[in-house]
Curated annotation (Swiss-Prot):
Residue window of motif Selectivity filter part_3: 355-359
Protein name per its UniProtKB record: H(+)/Cl(-) exchange transporter ClcA
Catalytic reaction annotation: 2 chloride(in) + H(+)(out) = 2 chloride(out) + H(+)(in)
Placement of sequence motif Selectivity filter part_1: 106-110
């Protein structure tokens, strides 16, 4: 009897253990539905705000250009008006940033990276209106900036806003929704959902806590953001360059050469960005009046430049198809490239609210097309198409500068719908990234974040020192 009882108890214990193991196994992949629901909300909001931001910037640009068209026959009015309109619009952006939310200046992507590490604040109630309205001013003025930086920062801040509205206190939820909003923001800017996901995994890999919950939330947010974008803007690729021919195997070595060129250009470009930032900091010294006037002057010059050489101003999306089609000579391509390098440095490094992705894509297109046209002359037996080198170069500068080759490859392929060029793009972007790393170049966003944190620590140390001095007196 005792033996039967012992056997029965042993069997019950085994059953309970198995049941507990099955329960734990089932719960291991049980993503909290609340986080997925909030990720869907964040993605939807980011898509709506991203589309609204794009439409608002286009409206400001059209209003400015429309005003200039009215006086196009009167040169004595046209040139001053072009300067004044762009200067005033730019000054709005600079003033709002400096006065209400300094963290909204520049791209905003380093701020999201810092927030993921709990090193930078997320004041969404300030950043959202400042980044939106300020970006309308600077991008509407025709400055050489992109809208992807604002939408990424706006998306991340929307993620924190949703978290606060639903009163979630979990550190995991806070981190996950911030990353979800950032990924949805990139997707909303470029209609590139896969690039948005890869951007979080690759570019923000030191900060992103990869687990089943976070990655499912990012997927959910990006899906919703992309759906919203396509409802309003359609499903066509954001950059229309047409279907280009494949790259024959015997020409792939040329793409490696192109990657080597960008591997040299990337670190130099990053160094110029940082040095220009230091130059502007020395000029205005943190004084809001000097900073706003400086921004107005840069904006006004971009307005004038838009009259002289329209291709040298603006984010660059309109320039990319024209350049990739081979409508410029090699000399003119290089001239526009140098001009846009200068304008990109002035606009981005001055702290204007706006991104640098779009300007870098345009720069890569210009240099890639110039290389392709030169190679076509040097190697006529290959029957090369310059547009394929334009596509490869478009992602190569981003890969070398930001050190995110996968994101650069997928982003360009999604934006242009030329997936058949994936092999030459891999060769170009990988070559650019490896050489940039070998030359000692540092990722641009990580370097900017490190400088921001160093400045933050210095300011905090100065405050503590002043407080101690006050107590001693």
């Amino acid at each position: 009897m005792k033996t039967d009882t012992s056997t029965f108890l042993a069997q019950q214990i085994v059953r309970l253990r198995r049941r507990d193991q099955i329960r734990r196994l089932m719960q291991r992949d049980k993503t909290p539905l609340a986080i997925l629901f909030m990720a869907a909300v964040v993605g939807t909001l980011t898509g709506l705000v991203g589309v609204a931001f794009e439409k608002a910037v286009s409206w400001v640009q059209n209003m400015r250009i429309g005003a200039l068209v009215q006086v196009a026959d009167h040169a004595f009015l046209l040139w001053p008006l072009a300067f004044i309109l762009s200067a005033l619009l730019a000054m709005v952006g600079y003033f709002l940033v400096r006065k209400f939310a300094p963290e909204a200046g520049g791209s905003g992507i380093p701020e999201i990276e810092g927030a993921l590490e709990e090193l930078r604040p997320v004041r969404w109630w300030r950043v959202l209106p400042v980044k939106f309205i300020g970006g309308m001013g600077t991008l509407g003025a025709g400055m050489v900036l992109g809208r992807e930086g604002p939408t990424v920062q706006i998306g991340g801040n929307l993620g924190r806003m949703v978290l606060d509205v639903f009163r979630m206190r979990s550190a995991e939820a806070r981190h996950t929704l911030l990353a979800t909003g950032a990924a949805a923001g990139l997707s909303a800017a470029f209609n590139a959902p896969l690039a948005g996901i890869l951007f979080i995994i690759e570019e923000m890999r030191p900060q992103f806590r990869y687990n089943l919950i976070s990655i499912k939330a990012v997927f959910t947010g990006v899906i919703m953001s992309s759906i919203v974008f396509r409802i309003f803007n359609g499903e066509a690729p954001i950059i229309e360059v047409g279907k280009l021919s494949d790259a024959p195997v015997n020409t792939l070595w040329l793409y490696l050469i192109l990657g080597i060129i960008f591997g040299c250009v990337g670190p130099v470009f990053n160094s110029l960005v940082l040095r220009t930032q230091d130059m502007f900091q020395r000029f205005h010294g943190g004084e809001i009046k000097k900073w706003v006037l400086m921004g107005g002057a840069i904006g006004g010059l971009c307005g004038i430049l838009g009259l002289i050489e329209p291709e040298a101003a603006g984010g660059g999306f309109n320039l990319i198809p024209i350049a990739a089609a081979g409508n410029f000579s090699v000399g003119l391509l290089l001239f526009i490239f140098i001009t846009r390098v200068v304008t990109t440095l002035l606009c981005f490094s001055s702290g204007a609210p706006g991104g640098i992705f779009a300007p870098m894509l345009a720069l890569g297109t210009l240099l890639g097309t110039a290389f392709g046209m030169a190679a076509a002359v040097l190697f006529p037996q290959y029957h090369l198409e310059a547009g394929t080198f334009a596509i490869a170069g478009m992602g190569a500068l981003m890969a070398a500068s930001v050190r995110a080759p996968l994101t650069g490859i997928v982003l360009v392929l999604e934006m242009t719908d030329n997936y058949q060029l994936i092999l030459p793009m891999i060769i170009t972007c990988l070559g650019a990234t490896l050489l940039a790393q070998f030359l000692g170049g540092k990722p641009l966003y990580s370097t900017i974040l490190a400088r921001t944190l160093a400045k933050q620590d210095a300011e905090q140390a100065a405050k503590n020192q002043n407080a101690s001095a006050g107590e001693n007196t």
